[in-house]
Amino acid sequence: SDPSQDFYGSPDPDYLKTTIPLFQKAGLPAQNIQDILQTGIYITNAVKTPKSDYTIERSTIETSLPYLEKELSLFPNTKVIMLMGDVAKKAFNMLTKKATGKNAVPSTSTYKLRTTELYYETIRIIPSYIITGGNILIEKSKAQMASQDITTMLRLIQ
């Protein structure tokens, strides 16, 4: 719950300790968040408050939605949105359901959705795995898939 450990909170935050290696594995020679930003990629959290329990309640996601919605509106030329983890999928579906009456991402496992081309309006949606926290580096198959998904995103934004 230390804000300095968020993506943009300090020069070497905890969140980037797993994120940077995944981007590097995907072919982006990033050393820091600025390198990722220079590529036209903005990383954010779907939930804007620190996690206080193992799971994140729907009400916690709902509290963050206005901030996430405003944040997304700052990027009118977005080509791709990667949803890194189940909470990101839930939050994005809550936003799209509010706007269109339906979910942009089917409630199917990420593993099954990864190869499906999903769109919200003209924006390509790529469901993937959460890229922060030590577990992603332990779960080698998820790290591999997240890296492959980042490669797909990089190809689409070039």
Segments and roles (model prediction):
Residues 40-86, 90:
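Internal catalytic-core helix/loop-beta-alpha segment
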Residues 1-37:
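Adenosine ribonucleotide-centric catalytic and binding domains
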Residues 54-69, 98-158:
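C-terminal capping/extension of enzyme domains
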Residues 1-3, 51-52, 88-92, 133-137:
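Short catalytic/ligand-binding loop motif for oxyanion handling, primarily in non-cytosolic enzymes
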Residues 38-44, 123-126:
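Short coil-to-beta-strand
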Residues 77-87, 94-95, 101-112:
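Membrane-associated lipid acylation/remodeling enzymes share a hydrophobic transmembrane-juxtamembrane segment
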Residues 32-35, 47-48, 129-132:
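Acidic carboxylate-rich catalytic motifs and surrounding loops in phosphoryl-/glycosyl-chemistry enzymes
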Residues 5-7, 93-96:
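Short amphipathic alpha-helical segments
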